[in-house]
């Protein structure tokens, strides 16, 4: 009998006390949508936070996951730490553990884990989804249109984007590819390239979509917030 998949959700969080609760509630809703035979775990990495991020996370996850403290100040290192803790907590086979990655300023849909599970069950080793922006209030009025025009999605529903905020990978493939590296930015593209080079079966689909914050100032240098901010300015 095939061992059911275990879903481990990993979320790095740095000074995210304002948005973290929204993220955790959405993740919990997604966990509740999983089939009863599928186990899940939630690991939040409070990375070099100076606000109440750790406490917000701890108050939420008690009994439903764990919170890890990190002083790395590096998103790649924080993600890697979260995965290590996830794999310490799951004793089953690595090829039956799915690592679902998102960010603390995101809101995932109720079917987010279900949808990744469906790809895992059909033999995929990794999934790359897209992001949409929750609000452009911090930006000039035309930024929304500029972003949506530039954010390419192919007619068949595939896309060229890679976001750590919406990346799933089977644990054995993750380990074979070398895992998250200690990168301050573009750690997601780096891992995805190594998964591709390793010939792991992967898919990039727009049907996997999470909402992310539209803030101008993000946590990672040259991250998504910087991409959005660059759309401001003279037309």
Residue map of PLM features:
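A conserved acidic beta->alpha catalytic loop
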Residues: 43-55, 106
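Acidic donor-binding/catalytic loop of UDP-sugar-dependent glycosyltransferases
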Residues: 52, 95-97, 102-118
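Short beta-strand/loop segment that forms part of the nucleotide-sugar
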Residues: 36-48, 68-71
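Conserved donor NDP-sugar-binding/catalytic core segment of glycosyltransferases
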Residues: 111-141
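Acidic donor-binding loop at a coil-to-helix junction in glycosyltransferase catalytic cores
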Residues: 185-191
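Short, well-formed alpha-helical segments that are part of the catalytic scaffolds
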Residues: 16-33
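Conserved donor nucleotide-binding strand/loop of the catalytic core
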Residues: 55-93
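Short, flexible, basic/aromatic active-site loop/helix in glycosyltransferases
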Residues: 140-160, 232-233
């Amino acid at each position: 009998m095939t061992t059911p998949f275990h879903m481990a959700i990993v979320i790095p969080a740095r000074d995210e006390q304002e948005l973290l609760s929204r993220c955790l509630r959405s993740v919990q809703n997604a966990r509740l949508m999983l089939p009863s035979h599928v186990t899940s775990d939630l690991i939040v990495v409070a990375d070099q936070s100076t606000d109440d991020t750790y406490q917000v996370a701890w108050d939420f996850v008690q009994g439903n996951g764990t919170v890890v403290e990190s002083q790395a100040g590096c998103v790649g290192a924080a993600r890697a730490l979260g995965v290590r803790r996830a794999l310490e907590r799951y004793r089953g086979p690595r090829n039956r553990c799915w690592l679902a990655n998102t960010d603390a300023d995101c809101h995932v849909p109720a079917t987010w884990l279900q949808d990744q599970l469906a790809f895992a069950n059909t033999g995929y080793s990794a999934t790359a989804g897209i992001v949409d922006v929750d609000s452009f209030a911090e930006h000039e009025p035309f930024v929304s249109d500029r972003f949506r025009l530039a954010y390419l999605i192919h007619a068949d529903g595939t896309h060229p984007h890679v976001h750590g905020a919406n990346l799933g990978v089977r644990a054995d493939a993750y380990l074979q590819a070398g895992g998250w590296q200690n990168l301050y930015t573009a750690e997601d593209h780096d891992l995805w390239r190594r998964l591709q080079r390793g010939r792991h079966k992967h898919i990039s689909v727009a049907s996997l979509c999470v909402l992310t914050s539209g803030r101008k100032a993000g946590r990672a240098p040259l991250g998504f917030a910087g991409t959005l901010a660059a759309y401001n300015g003279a037309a």
